[in-house]
Amino acid sequence: MRVRALMTAALAGMAMLATQTTATAQQAGDPLSEKQWGLAQLRAPEAWSTSTGAGQIIAVVDTGVDLGHPELASKLVPGATFAACGDRPAPCGNGDWRGVDGVGQASDVHGTHVAGIAAAAANNGVGIAGVAPDARIMPVKALENGSGSFEEIGAGIRWATDHGANVINLSLGAQPGTQLLTLLGQGAETKDAIAYAREKGVVVVASAGNETAPLCDTPSWEAGALCVAATDSAELHSVYSNLTLKPDMKAVAAPGGSSLNGCDGDVWSAVPRGTGSAKCGQGDYDSLAGTSMAAPQVAGVAALLGAQGRNADSIEQALMKSARTPILGARGVFTPLYGYGVVDAAAAVAQPM
């Protein structure tokens, strides 16, 4: 069984799933940041005076990353490739999006986009700003041509855990119904790897899924993973997003875009150089939608919290207790649409340690 990256098919054409002063300064340093409505929804700029994620490593277990992208090149720590490495997953590359054959697949722009959302460089004169602009990125390529096996993904999670990751982002998921198979012991490699990461004190953030299903997909369904649903620019539950139901109820929501309201209604981030789409792209940048785009927003806020010296349990509690439920205005109250609410970076970093 294969697990897929999770950006919306409608947008991508493939089955993959501050204060005013601060904002103005950010736009001057990052020209596309004026399109990043997600940062405002997260209240990330208001959190940066407290934490920018310095010293934290976010592992992006995904399709690999463009290692030379100007938003990411200066921020990378050594990564690894587990996709298409032979019969048994073992590192056979450095996490580059082009894979072992050196050929970048169209669907494999996904990992660079996810990495940029989480931790793109800020105030560098180009593009965007990441949620945790001073965090580092560990590129782990476990998906090739948009999909990978439970074994490859599990190996990537374990490798990232053993090589210093503080946060692991999983913007990927299996088809609805796979939850039952994992409960019966199939596909246990990813489930067991998530448990291993949590035992080692790593925060694991995963996409809820894009099937409008009632449950979090595997692997966000698994105990130890924080399931992330998507919101649109109006802070409403995105039409494609799964609900946040799972046994341990560890779930939140974050900006993922609508897939219906044009390029600027979705999430702008980096893509491998020169691969921006004709519809929305600007060469090295593009706008995509999906719970894949929501998860790294939360991974970035987790890095902001980790840089404050919090452990994994404290990070998860700060994320959930400070999250806000749209319309109701409540904080830290579980609903199926939003989990414990839309993540609020400024409120999270202000939570007691």
Place the predicted regions along the sequence by residue.
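Substrate-binding/access-modulating region of protease and related hydrolase catalytic domains
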Residues: V140-G224, L236, A278-P296, G329-L337
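Active-site core segment of subtilase-fold serine proteases
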Residues: A28-D134, A155, D162, A174-Q175, ...
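Short helix-loop-beta-strand segments that form the rim/entrance of peptidase-like active sites
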Residues: D62, G125-N145, I168-L172, N311-A323
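Extracellular S/T/G-rich loop segment that most often corresponds to the catalytic His/Ser-adjacent loop
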Residues: W221-R310, A346-A350
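Structural detector of well-ordered beta-strand residues that form the stable sheet scaffold
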Residues: V77, M138, V203-V205, L226-C227, ...
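Solvent-exposed loop/turn segments at secondary-structure junctions
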Residues: T63-L67, F82-A84, A122-N124, L143-S147, ...
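C-terminal subdomain of the subtilisin-like protease fold in secreted/lumenal serine endopeptidases
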Residues: Q36, R43, G164-S171, Q175, ...
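Secretory targeting and sorting signals
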Residues: M1-A25
